[in-house]
Amino acid sequence: MKLIIATRKSQLALWQSEHVAQILKNTHQIEVLLEGFKTKGDVLLDSPLAKIGGKGLFTKELEESMLRKEAHLAVHSLKDVPSFFPRGLVLAAVSKREQSNDAMLSQNYKDFLSLPKGAKIGTTSLRRKMQLLLLRPDLEIISLRGNVNSRIEKLKNNDFDAIILAMAGIKRLNLDKQVNFVYEFSKDELIPAASQGALGIESINDEKILELLKCLNDENALIETSIEREFIATLEGGCQVPIGINAELLGDEICVRAVLGLPDGSEILKDKRMIKKNDFKGFGESLAKEFIAKGAKELLKKAESMI
């Protein structure tokens, strides 16, 4: 049997797809091929993600290729995957999670506190912008899109004092070797995006394919990301609004951190809970409902009007 993986052509996307392909080859001794596609999010680089549609920007073309039967599966950064799937496609697996926190890369400043007043920080994420301004209202947050290499080049050219990336991507591509300083934010400083660091394997809804993909599943990653995705789905939030949610398994307990608010950090709702591992089902939804009772929907509408 031969499996075809639909993939974006960026360096990180190719790494992720090749990583999954290798596991499938080693486990089942089958042929696995990669088929590259450009998504809307890869082409429209001049506008912030929030203004051109948020989630689905990096998945739609890959999903269409599967629906046309040109590919059997696609490997995504799970944080880019919408909560609901087109008919005929399913979330087949969530693989073992890489570090889920964010990090600051800089050529001249070793940590966040050493940044000078008014420092220029590159990130396109409204979630990061909100939390960075909450910590340091003096910073100038500038939209930064494009592939990872172009972002690093802009940092080296002194267009920015620092840029913010996910630690997962930094580790997968060894980006720490390309810059002078990497400062890892704690999850209390910067609450990550839902499913950050996890790979989501989307596939056609076919029993034989789903059976082959079972080997990619990681139980801990499934538990953590199910809480996070449930929270986002209940709030009906996506990339276009500033929401952070992270569930972290610590033995038989789970630490859940959540935040949402306005992009400028002037108004936020934030919470941190410890729950028993056995109580994870439905917790994302119940936490979201608590946020809604505190005015989360109104705050997110206000956030959308500010974009």
Curated annotation (Swiss-Prot):
EC number: 2.5.1.61
S-(dipyrrolylmethanemethyl)cysteine found at: C239
Enzyme superclass (EC): transferase
Keyword entries, A-Z: Porphyrin biosynthesis, Transferase
One CC-aspect GO term: cytoplasm
Reactions this protein catalyses: 4 porphobilinogen + H2O = hydroxymethylbilane + 4 NH4(+)
Cross-referenced SUPFAM superfamilies: Periplasmic binding protein-like II, Porphobilinogen deaminase (hydroxymethylbilane synthase), C-terminal domain
Other observations noted: The porphobilinogen subunits are added to the dipyrromethane group.
Protein name: Porphobilinogen deaminase
Organism from which the protein derives: Campylobacter jejuni subsp. jejuni serotype O:6 (strain 81116 / NCTC 11828)
